[in-house]
């Protein structure tokens, strides 16, 4: 069962406006979804980023680690009628319920009405985030570009009825190859990214390079399994995204 925390209020680093977000408390996994060669699995939440979203106030990308955490909201809005308030005043409000209600009522309306952070999940979301801040740190740029790669590949993923998960515009098609080449630059020399590197080379049609990279993957109990499967695709000169 997927469950979320009570709302957490943050201040946007760009406009100082407020937004709310929820963290995952527990997550439901579907056992019958495919695992794809680009590293994205079929879980509904797989491509969404929990590290960055779109501020509902100024509509710019906001990284959670840059946003100031203001407060945690209660899961349910504190409310109390007149008789309840009188009772708690007379009895000393021993459990603090009246204090909680009064503190809530004293909060600015704008804070209480803060809208949710808009999560990035579509290709255009990640393109916009990269365009807004072209001087991202390598780690942040990689985070966005990998998810853009996944989102652009969604046109090749299919649901249970054989329908493509997403369409792709001309602009998105034109950016797909440069995006993959840039990811290759960003992961150059990273031993942990060898499977990703091999898959990118395969999708770019550089099959011999892909095979060489995948054969050199260091076993860790999982990576080598993916590497062997992707290597077979590269050896067969198959460049398209494939379920593993």
Task: Give the label of every model feature segment.
Residues 1-85:
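N-terminal cysteine/histidine-rich coordination modules
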Residues 81-166, 189-203:
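Amphipathic alpha-helical repeat scaffolds of TPR domains
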Residues 127, 180, 214-215:
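Inward-facing hydrophobic residues that define packing positions of alpha-helical scaffold repeats
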Residues 183, 216-220, 224:
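Alpha-helical solenoid scaffolds that mediate protein-protein interactions
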Residues 195-203, 229-239:
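"A position-specific structural signal for the A-helix of alpha-solenoid helical repeats
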């Amino acid at each position: 069962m997927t469950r979320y925390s009570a709302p957490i209020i943050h201040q946007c680093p760009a406009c100082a406006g407020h937004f709310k977000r929820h963290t995952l408390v527990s997550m439901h996994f579907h056992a019958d979804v495919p695992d794809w060669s680009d590293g994205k699995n079929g879980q509904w939440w797989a491509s969404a980023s929990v590290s960055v979203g779109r501020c509902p106030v100024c509509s710019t990308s906001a990284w959670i680690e840059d946003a100031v955490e203001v407060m945690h909201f209660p899961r349910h809005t504190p409310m109390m009628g007149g008789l309840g308030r009188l009772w708690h005043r007379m009895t000393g409000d021993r459990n603090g319920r009246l204090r909680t209600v009064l503190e809530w009522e004293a909060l600015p309306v704008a804070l209480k009405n803060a809208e949710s952070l808009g999560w990035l999940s579509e290709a255009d979301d990640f393109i916009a985030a990269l365009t807004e801040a072209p001087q991202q740190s390598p780690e942040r740029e990689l985070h966005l570009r990998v998810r853009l790669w996944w989102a652009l590949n969604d046109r090749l993923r299919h649901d249970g009825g054989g329908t493509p998960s997403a369409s792709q515009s001309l602009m998105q098609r034109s950016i797909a190859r440069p995006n993959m080449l840039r990811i290759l630059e960003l992961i150059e020399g990273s031993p942990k990214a060898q499977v990703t590197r091999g898959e990118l080379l395969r999708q770019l049609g550089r099959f011999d390079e892909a095979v060489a990279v995948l054969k050199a993957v260091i076993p860790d109990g999982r990576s080598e399994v993916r590497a062997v499967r992707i290597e077979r695709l590269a050896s067969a000169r198959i460049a398209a995204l494939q379920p593993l």
